[in-house]
Amino acid sequence: MGKRNLDETMNESAVSEIAEDVAALTTEKDEYQALCELVNPIAQPLANRKLAKKVYKLIKKAAAGEKTLREGIKDVQKELRKNEKGICILAGNVSPIDVYSHIPAICEEKEIPYVYIPSREQLGLAVGHRRPSILIFVKPSADFQELYDEVAETLHHLTVDAA
């Protein structure tokens, strides 16, 4: 097993395919409604289409930064145990639900805003890769502080209304 050259692993067609997938993050109104019908029963509060678009934008900016985004159950649980401040974003179409059903309770206990997004595939694309993601934790950063504050305030009101 020799080392691969960069030319072998990252050809231009693969990069353009990922760019097309990321560009497809915006969904039409009826597509979004169809995705919302596929979510599991515990997916509350579920982001509306406009809020989901802002959350995707926040995730893209956080993914570009360093150490501002955590992905996956283990990493997010570690951040929550450390009492880090941030926003928790969960995918709504995860099966079985038992995998991450305890996360909203932890977020409420630690007063961390959280929201469900209808599709784990789109959550993965927002991070910048093709693999689906079920759970993302975004920490505040000076690079995108204004957008972070806006989304956090909206999520805080969403969480209070749903309780």
From Swiss-Prot:
UniProt cross-references to InterPro entries, sorted A to Z: eL8/uL1-like, H/ACA_rnp_Nhp2-like, Ribosomal_eL30-like_sf, Ribosomal_eL8-like_CS, Ribosomal_eL8/eL30/eS12/Gad45, Ribosomal_eL8/Nhp2
GO CC list: box H/ACA snoRNP complex; sno(s)RNA-containing ribonucleoprotein complex
Transferase found in the keyword field: no
Subcellular location(s) per record: Nucleus, Nucleolus
GO MF annotations in UniProt: box H/ACA snoRNA binding
PROSITE patterns with a match to the protein in the record: RIBOSOMAL_L7AE
Biological process according to GO: rRNA pseudouridine synthesis; snRNA pseudouridine synthesis
Functional summary from the UniProt entry: Required for ribosome biogenesis. Part of a complex which catalyzes pseudouridylation of rRNA. This involves the isomerization of uridine such that the ribose is subsequently attached to C5, instead of the normal N1. Pseudouridine ('psi') residues may serve to stabilize the conformation of rRNAs.
Name of the protein described by the UniProt record: Putative H/ACA ribonucleoprotein complex subunit 2-like protein
Native source organism of the sequence: Caenorhabditis briggsae
